[in-house]
Amino acid sequence: MPDAVTAPGNQCDVLARAVASPRALGRGEMAALLSLEGEEEVGALFAAARSVKVAVCGHGVALRGLLEVGNVCEKDCFYCGIRRSNGSVTRYRLGADEIVRLAEAAAAQGYDSLVVQSGEIESEDQTRLVEETLRRIAPLGLGVTLSLGEQSEETYRRWREAGAVRYLLRIETSSEALYGRLHPADHSWARRVECLRALRRCGYQVGTGVMCGLPGQTAEDLADDIRFFADMDVDMIGMGPFIPHPDTPLAGEPMDPKARLLLGLKMIAVTRLYLHDVNIAAATALQALAPDGRERGVLAGANVVMPNVTDVEHRRLYKLYANKPCLDEPSGRCRGCLERRLASIGETIVSGRSGDSLHYRRRMAAKGGEP
């Protein structure tokens, strides 16, 4: 790690510069910050990132109710528990009636934003199901984020016209070489990047993200991931620690929960320092590594949390990684618990379309559009 960052006085200067201006850090500086291990140095990093989060978002956290509508997936990613080759998974796909019922329940619990997530399926049947569901959900007034993987631009456009406002498509890593080692040959990094561009053309608020702690991944790779977020001009970021799933080719990868959690938190912090005004989620995977993982994510600079509003029966079947938390907790109780936990760290829940990222609102204002 470069002395220019790790020396205490110099680290203070680097952090002060990052707090003062977005995109002020070089690749080497970001990699060095991501490599910090000393308690005092890491604490200073988190404090700097939180100061930016508070300046941009206040002491508020936006909630997105997470609705996992199916675990059928055409992809075969080597790290994912619902990959198509995993024969031990009991597969399910919710119909429009079930999805609408769960969306209505989420709205009744006070959610005004919903993330609809499933395994990746490209078919006209899937396109129509999502289209119908979006139109039926529309009267609830929910801001809907879709996370349904790679699709054609026409499909993205149809879903946007049916009422979706945000789309999260995680690139998983900005390194094409690393992506190739984590996926079969028929999976295309370039196509995933093009899908992100298509989403922007269709008018979505666009989100992406990566995993932290992948086999063979370096601090420089993660710094490049953050620069990728900037180059793609994304509005929101969802990223979390890599947690091996026992029924995948990467099941035997070494896992130090404490170190993996710390890396995930540092990635949130450095991303906040570099990009300032985007929405950053404290991933549920953080809670899989520590009971207070999501709160620690907020303290490191995140401003979005996504409580699970899927019914318990299906929530147990949607396991992307090991030790998924809150499998048996009813969604209503989960929200109340989260409110109390956020209050304990000085945060309140933000309601309404103010959940849009400041980055998105600024971009729309610059274009003369409505934020």
Where are these regions (language model features)?
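Conserved, mostly hydrophobic/aromatic
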Residues: 22, 49, 77, 169, ...
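Canonical Radical SAM [4Fe-4S] cluster-binding loop centered on the CxxxCxxC motif
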Residues: 58-98
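An N-cap/entry alpha-helix motif that binds or orients negatively charged groups
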Residues: 24-61
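Glycine-rich, proline-tolerant flexible connector loops at the mouths of alpha/beta enzymes
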Residues: 64-67, 87, 115-126, 243-254, ...
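Active-site-proximal loop/turn and secondary-structure-junction residues that shape catalytic pockets
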Residues: 67-71, 120-122, 148-152, 173-175, ...
